[in-house]
């Protein structure tokens, strides 16, 4: 069915920290290979917070990059004009002011993925 999308959102664990749900975006290429379905990643749901990494980049941006560089077809991210007033998922929502930076970062990661793809198409010694 071409109208079905597989979405990686993570699963609840007893650890519950540092992120809301455990997810391994290394599964993106595996799921694409096994199911032939488009794969969506949901870094908002898996990270669950607006935490900032020690390098100054929000964890949600890092998780997005991990999924996209692994070949995800799409991203599901929570945005809200005022996350503190959101009825659900406010703690993980990015603001609308952060959308341009998010899109710029997504474009950068997508370009990196496409370049990686070209590099491996040029190499003939990698075979399953």
Predicted regions located by residue number:
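Catalytic alpha/beta core domains of metabolic enzymes, predominantly
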Residues: 1-79
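Flexible, glycine/charged-enriched surface loops at secondary-structure junctions
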Residues: 3, 74-78, 113-124
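Flexible glycine/acidic-rich beta-alpha junction loops that bind and position SAM and/or redox cofactors
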Residues: 14-16, 51, 81-90, 119-127
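General N-terminal targeting signals
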Residues: 21-23, 56-57, 92-94, 111, ...
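C-terminal helical cap(s) of enzyme catalytic domains, especially alpha/beta-barrels
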Residues: 82-115
């Amino acid at each position: 069915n071409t109208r079905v999308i597989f979405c990686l959102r993570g699963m609840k664990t007893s650890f519950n920290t540092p992120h809301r749900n455990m997810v391994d975006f290394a599964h993106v290429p595996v799921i694409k290979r096994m199911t032939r379905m488009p794969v969506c990643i949901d870094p908002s749901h898996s990270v669950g917070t607006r935490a900032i990494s020690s390098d100054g980049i929000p964890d949600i941006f890092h998780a997005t990059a991990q999924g996209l560089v692994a070949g995800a077809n799409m991203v599901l991210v929570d945005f809200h004009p005022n996350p503190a007033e959101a009825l659900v998922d406010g703690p993980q929502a990015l603001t609308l002011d952060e959308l341009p930076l998010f899109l710029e970062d997504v474009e950068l990661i997508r370009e990196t993925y496409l370049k990686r793809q070209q590099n491996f198409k040029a190499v003939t010694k990698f075979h399953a």
